Amino acid sequence: DKMSREKIFNLKAMGAEVVLTRSDVAKGHPEYYQDLAARIASETPGAFFVNQFGNPDNPAAHEFGTGPEILRQMDGQLDAIVFGCGSSGTMTGLSRAFAEQAPNVELILADPIGSILTEYINEGTLSEKSGSWMVEGIGEDFLPQISDFTRVKIAYAISDKESFLTARELLAKEGI
């Protein structure tokens, strides 16, 4: 229920059946988005559950694609990168790419208030209780199987309000 209307419309335009899930239920609940996706895939002939949270191809795509591309576009002049984290594929892949090609790049997590990742990065403790947030696609209530946070130096908890205001400012000033 946090997916933008535009993404839903685009998926439907390409012929996809979109099943909206609840964001107020935890892992293990029958309506939890990952559990529901796995169940739909297992009950649908010919279906495949991509499982972005456990699929090693997710971080590999960023380790060998996104990371080198960022370094090329920046002519290797990169001091730090600030990112959000959902499945952790981008973060894990970038971390691996930069460890090899630009080990001095600092990785910084911008995490929604309510996600367990800020506390995990900053304090090393893993909370079993998460809050709720409205920002789409980032923040977690568990550590994804593919995650590797060892190179992330610091995390900042960002409110939904600040996130949405910053997104609007970037759109107005930078066109992104």
Spell out what each predicted region is:
Residues 90:
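Hydrophobic/small residue at the entry helix of a nucleotide-binding pocket
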Residues 1-40, 113, 117-126, 130, ...:
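Active-site-proximal loop->helix
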Residues 7, 70-73, 97-98, 143-146:
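Short, flexible, glycine/charge-rich loop motifs used to bind or transfer phosphoryl groups or to couple energy/partner
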